[in-house]
UniProtKB/Swiss-Prot annotation:
GO terms for cellular component: membrane. This is Transmembrane and coiled-coil domain-containing protein 6. The gene is TMCO6. One of its GO terms (molecular function) is nuclear import signal receptor activity. GO terms for biological process: protein import into nucleus. The keyword Transmembrane helix applies. It is found in: Membrane. Keywords: Coiled coil, Membrane, Transmembrane, Transmembrane helix. It comes from Homo sapiens (Human). Disulfide bonds: none annotated. The chain crosses the membrane at residues 338-358, 386-406. Residues 15-84 form a coiled coil.
Length: 493
């Protein structure tokens, strides 16, 4: 959901509509990549006792006879400890894919396990749930679908009095959700959304983190925009998610990361982003951005990027919504502190996590695309030179930096006057030496704006061998029209 600024007029050979078409294609590819690069994963909770985890107690692969034996002992044993021990042995065997396949092939095995899950003995219940959890971690969808008879009970136990048991059920559901559409199809009418909405009011951090995980798995389903997200938006979950992201002493980083990704998936679906904006999503995320910038100034902890990444994406995507203006969304962020905070994060990423620079620049692009006030903040805070220092990082970063500068320049003569003179022209002459077509193309666009609004730039460009820099690209099909137009402008100027 990248909002690129509107292109400027070009020579008729490469008209505005053609440029828009190319840009739409690039944006579609970017949106697709961002949707596909999601955090689809599974999580495994194992709390083996020390004596179980020792080297001399490696879990063995179980055959049919052993699986049947452990199930029989767990179901009919005379002592509770014997029954519990049988389930522990079964659970440890289920860590192996071979045992998992053996288990689901055995007739009545899942029925027996579900029976133990619903027993009135808490320890047996817990061990049966742990067995299901091991099965849920399988990479085979057939194993997940074999667990279908247990899903309604897992949902019921989300209202249990034991926070540990609720946490286990949530992670198990999350693992099953991501593996099989059949599981999701069954869980929706069984009431998973109301069950999750009830869980979000839990006072236990571990439960909230597990809830965020299960919800994020549900939101990443291919059918989520049509079949899942509308019911989530109709529940109390969005308001509670935003509360979990409010900065302050109650903010828990682990919980915040989970719910920030949940919010990201909802926003990417574009089902009802005006609703989220109306709930104050922009102001909440903007305050969280300020909080993150303050945190990176106090700590060397690189783990902060786990939260920064989804927060930046959420803000960037929300700013592309038409509803931002109609509900006063821009006003929720109209503060130069947001720009200053973003640059603190960009410097942090530059030093510690360069792969996240595009996320921050993507937000800066969307802030400046249609907002003269944010462009003014960029200039008044003297942030052009720090921005130019990011150009050598990568071609992707270079394009985004140049796009932001184009956003500023296209606001007119007053803005170009403040961009000039300075390090901008030497930087542009340097980027014209790049071999990447998109970097050079964006450099040409910025030069075009400078020539248009700051005519004195033309003479300096000529004095610094600008024409020779242009000549190396005049045979490139994607660039030659723009190169020719700039050459003519420079010579006529």
């Amino acid at each position: 959901m990248w909002s690129r600024r509107q292109g400027r007029l070009r020579p008729t050979v490469c008209g505005v509509e053609e440029l828009r078409r190319r840009r739409r294609e690039r944006e579609a590819a970017l949106r697709k990549a961002r949707r596909e690069q999601q955090l689809v994963s599974k999580r495994l909770l194992r709390n083996d006792a020390p004596e179980e985890a020792g080297e001399g107690c490696v879990a063995a692969i179980l055959g049919e006879t052993e699986v049947q034996q452990f199930l029989r002992q767990a179901q009919r044993g005379t002592e509770e400890k014997e029954r519990e021990g049988a389930l522990v042995s079964l659970r440890r065997g289920l860590q192996h894919p071979e045992t998992q396949q053996t288990f689901i092939r055995l007739e009545g095995s899942m029925r027996t396990l579900v029976g133990l899950l619903t027993s009135n003995q808490a320890l047996l219940q817990l061990e049966a749930a742990r067995c299901l959890h091991e099965l849920s971690h399988s990479e085979q969808s057939t194993v997940a679908e074999a667990c279908l008879p247990a899903t309604s009970y897992l949902l019921t136990y989300l209202s249990s009095h034991s926070s540990d048991f609720i946490e286990l059920c949530l992670y198990t559901l999350g693992n099953l959700i991501v593996e099989s559409e059949a599981v999701r199809r069954q869980l929706l009418p069984q009431g998973i959304v109301p069950a999750l909405a009830a869980c979000i009011q839990s006072p236990h951090v571990a439960v909230l983190e597990a809830l965020g995980y299960a919800l994020s798995q549900l939101l990443q389903a291919e059918e989520a925009p049509e079949k899942i997200i509308p019911s989530i938006l109709a529940s109390t979950l969005p308001q509670h998610m935003l509360q979990m992201l409010q900065p302050g002493p109650k903010l828990n980083p682990g919980v915040a990361v989970e719910f920030a990704w949940c919010l990201h998936y909802i926003i990417c679906s574009q089902v009802s982003n005006p609703l989220l904006i109306g709930h104050g999503a922009l102001s909440t995320l903007g305050l969280l951005l300020l909080d993150l910038a303050g945190a990176v100034q106090k700590t060397e902890d690189a783990g902060l990027e786990l939260l920064a990444c989804p927060v930046l994406r959420c803000l960037s995507n929300l700013l592309t919504e038409a509803a931002v203006e109609t509900v006063g969304g821009q006003m929720q962020l109209r503060d130069e502190r947001v720009v200053a905070a973003l640059f603190i994060l960009l410097q942090f990423f530059f030093q510690k996590q360069p792969s996240l620079l595009p996320e921050g620049l993507w937000l800066l692009n969307n802030l400046t695309a249609n907002s003269p006030s944010f462009c003014t903040s960029l200039l008044s805070l003297d942030l052009i030179e720090p921005l130019l220092q990011l150009l050598p990082v990568s071609n992707v970063v270079s394009v985004m930096v140049l796009t932001v500068l184009c956003n500023v320049a296209e606001k007119g003569p007053a803005y170009c006057q403040r961009l000039w003179p300075g390090p901008l022209l030497p930087a542009l002459l340097h980027t014209l030496a790049f071999s990447d077509t998109e970097v050079v193309g964006q450099s040409l666009e910025l030069l075009h704006l400078l020539f248009l609004y700051q005519p004195e730039a033309v003479q300096v460009f000529l004095q610094q061998s600008g024409l020779q820099a242009l000549e190396r690209h005049q045979e490139e099909a994607q660039l030659q029209d723009r190169v020719y137009a700039l050459q003519q402008t420079a010579l006529q100027g």
